[in-house]
Amino acid sequence: MARYTGPICRLCRREGMKLYLKGERCFTEHCAFDKRPYAPGDHGRQRGKLSQYGTQLRAKQVMRVIYGIPERQFEHYFEKALGMSGDTRENLVRLVESRVDNIVYRLGFAISRRQARQLVTHGHFSVNGVKIDIPSYKLRPGDIVEVREKSRSLAAIKHAVESSKDRTQVPWVEVDFDSYRGTFLRLPNLEEVTDLPVDVQAIVEFYSR
């Protein structure tokens, strides 16, 4: 399935919850979901009760949309998580959390994962001193993510840094805004990812049908 390229706010309305896909805008009066908190389309206000399958499908879609991952790639992440030892739910969360675009967002160098993905694709970051332009690149604990020297004057990055200085950092990353550098300290535990508004077990059940 190709990556969605339509209106971003439409995704929040479709899922029936605010997914904070536009960063700061989602906290303002301009948020489309706050204005129209129902699904798009002529019958958007008639959202019925979901079946068990529908609930599982929506959980999968919400997580996939939040992290900006195409369908086939997300399915690949699940298959990999299933084959790893330990809790499949935690494995899945750890796989998507260790993507470089997500860590760029977690560090505060972008105001949203969507913006982080664009910035990574355009080559504005390095990992351990090597330029990286693949958003899905998997980081390992101890990897250092840095804004490249020539990119530190970008308005988008400077704005993100200023906006993030007072933000509480998640405990699995560490950032030094003065040097435009951050470290992926460790893999997060499932219960630490408190801003993921889905039941990951429902996703496991969806793929285990």
Curated annotation (Swiss-Prot):
Subunit annotation: Part of the 30S ribosomal subunit. Contacts protein S5. The interaction surface between S4 and S5 is involved in control of translational fidelity.
Keyword RNA-binding set for record: yes
Domain S4 RNA-binding, chain residue ranges per copy: 98-158
GO annotation, biological process: ribosomal small subunit biogenesis; translation
CDD domains to which the protein is assigned, alphabetical: S4
Cellular component terms (Gene Ontology): small ribosomal subunit
Protein name: Small ribosomal subunit protein uS4
Keyword terms, alphabetized: Ribonucleoprotein, Ribosomal protein, RNA-binding, rRNA-binding
Signal peptide (UniProt feature, chain positions): none
InterPro entries according to UniProt: Ribosomal_uS4 (IPR022801), Ribosomal_uS4_bac-type (IPR005709), Ribosomal_uS4_N (IPR001912), S4_RNA-bd (IPR002942), S4_RNA-bd_sf (IPR036986)
Keyword RNA-binding carried by entry: yes
Gene: rpsD
Functional description taken from the UniProt entry: One of the primary rRNA binding proteins, it binds directly to 16S rRNA where it nucleates assembly of the body of the 30S subunit. With S5 and S12 plays an important role in translational accuracy.
Species this protein is from: Pseudothermotoga lettingae (strain ATCC BAA-301 / DSM 14385 / NBRC 107922 / TMO) (Thermotoga lettingae)
MF terms in GO: rRNA binding; structural constituent of ribosome
Highest classification ranks of the organism: Bacteria, Thermotogati, Thermotogota, Thermotogae, Thermotogales
Source superkingdom: Bacteria
Family the entry assigns: Belongs to the universal ribosomal protein uS4 family.
